Amino acid sequence: VKLNKRYLGAVILAPIIIFLLLGGVYLEGLIIILSLLGLYEFYNALKAKEFKPISIIGYFLIIFYYLSENNFSTIMYAVVFLTFIMLMVPVVNRKYTFLDVGVTILGFLYVGMLFSFIHLVNIKEHGQYLVWLIFVGSWITDTAAYYSGKLFGKHKLCPEVSPKKTLEGSIGGAVGATIVCGLYGLVLNLGFNIYIMPIYNFFIIGALCGIFSQFGDLVASSVKRYVGIKDYSNLIPGHGGILDRFDSILFSGLIVFYYLTFIVR
């Protein structure tokens, strides 16, 4: 039954590939939906520790962010203004505390903003090819880390957060992502004659995804361990929730966007 659930979950996740291929407004629409669902999971998880995030503010910020066409300066003005407003909420309504204000903003930054980097990479020049680095980097890291850990794992990586992860698995994941992302660049360049940037950048992006996607996984695990839950939700049968499946991708997305924006330009 558990295996059947995982297959069902895989079928539910499969359309994401189609949206990646379509790109544009289709991918943006998917990212908005995933952001809202992920933020709901995050806020709901924190309620287990008796936090009371002001959820409506977080959802509003996500919608406003996309309506402003992902304008960073506009959304920062909105975040500062709404934080200013929310800081007054605990004064007039003792149901909320200043910590609730903090986790409300944290949820938007962690889930809403990080999800948006997938869309922001996609709308760059050659973005229809570059966006795959986010997913390939994350998926290969996860797969290579699993098998490397299974074959060679002896030293625990972060036992208090994720007891099953090993240092050897972590290294294997990073190496795997570096190689596969580099090969992806070579295939684009030599196989399809699509030149985007020097090949070494693909290897570097792969290495960075290999490192930071694992941090994304560990951050999500540490939150779950802190609030005492196994999965963020059971939205995807056999796979947990949106944040369970996209935790590493959130960190890869930021890394790929920042590297392309500030290093490659």
Task: Mark where each language-model region is.
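C-terminal transmembrane helix pair
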Residues: 224, 249-257
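Hydrophobic transmembrane alpha-helices of multi-pass small-molecule transporters
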Residues: 14, 177-178, 245, 252-253, ...
